[in-house]
């Protein structure tokens, strides 16, 4: 089987998992998430472990391929190699997304943005983010449901939530308001992000 896909996902105390058909619901202290898997993947929750595997008929077909190659005296393919490319891809993706859900509802995800530039600052306006970025007007960003935004200091923004993809998406959207420019490095960047600098034109 796929090295990633075949691994069961341990579900820690404090989190609950419900499986109904192709739908996985995970609930924990950081929130609640839902994932609908493609038809080629079957989820299972047992003994505090969540697993996702190819559908039964696909497993049988892959095993038939292995047996046929073995009967011919050939070196048999691995289980993953016996699956279609589409099934392999969806298997690994489904496992990764399910693992991210469990991690998200128990520990959560966060990204920190830094504002670099004279006069650039961030502050909260209720639950919305207010940004001064050198424009003639302030920028107001409304946090989507399930995402928390904080501005502990004027040059720092913390984005957190249970959904890893949503946290990353919000960080990307905020960065777009003032991407780091390559000459002076001014703009909004991820904490620790390297901004490649260009040398300005010499007079």
UniProtKB/Swiss-Prot annotation:
<dbReference type="InterPro" id="IPR036789">
    <property type="entry name" value="Ribosomal_uL6-like_a/b-dom_sf"/>
</dbReference>
<protein>
    <recommendedName>
        <fullName>Large ribosomal subunit protein uL6</fullName>
    </recommendedName>
</protein>
<comment type="similarity">
    <text>Belongs to the universal ribosomal protein uL6 family.</text>
</comment>
<keyword id="KW-0687">Ribonucleoprotein</keyword>
<dbReference type="Pfam" id="PF00347">
    <property type="entry name" value="Ribosomal_L6"/>
</dbReference>
<keyword id="KW-0694">RNA-binding</keyword>
<dbReference type="GO" id="GO:0003735">
    <property type="term" value="F:structural constituent of ribosome"/>
</dbReference>
<keyword id="KW-0699">rRNA-binding</keyword>
<dbReference type="InterPro" id="IPR002358">
    <property type="entry name" value="Ribosomal_uL6_CS"/>
</dbReference>
<keyword id="KW-0689">Ribosomal protein</keyword>
<dbReference type="InterPro" id="IPR020040">
    <property type="entry name" value="Ribosomal_uL6_a/b-dom"/>
</dbReference>
<dbReference type="InterPro" id="IPR019906">
    <property type="entry name" value="Ribosomal_uL6_bac-type"/>
</dbReference>
<dbReference type="GO" id="GO:0022625">
    <property type="term" value="C:cytosolic large ribosomal subunit"/>
</dbReference>
<dbReference type="GO" id="GO:0019843">
    <property type="term" value="F:rRNA binding"/>
</dbReference>
<dbReference type="GO" id="GO:0002181">
    <property type="term" value="P:cytoplasmic translation"/>
</dbReference>
<comment type="function">
    <text>This protein binds to the 23S rRNA, and is important in its secondary structure. It is located near the subunit interface in the base of the L7/L12 stalk, and near the tRNA binding site of the peptidyltransferase center.</text>
</comment>
<dbReference type="InterPro" id="IPR000702">
    <property type="entry name" value="Ribosomal_uL6-like"/>
</dbReference>
<comment type="subunit">
    <text>Part of the 50S ribosomal subunit.</text>
</comment>
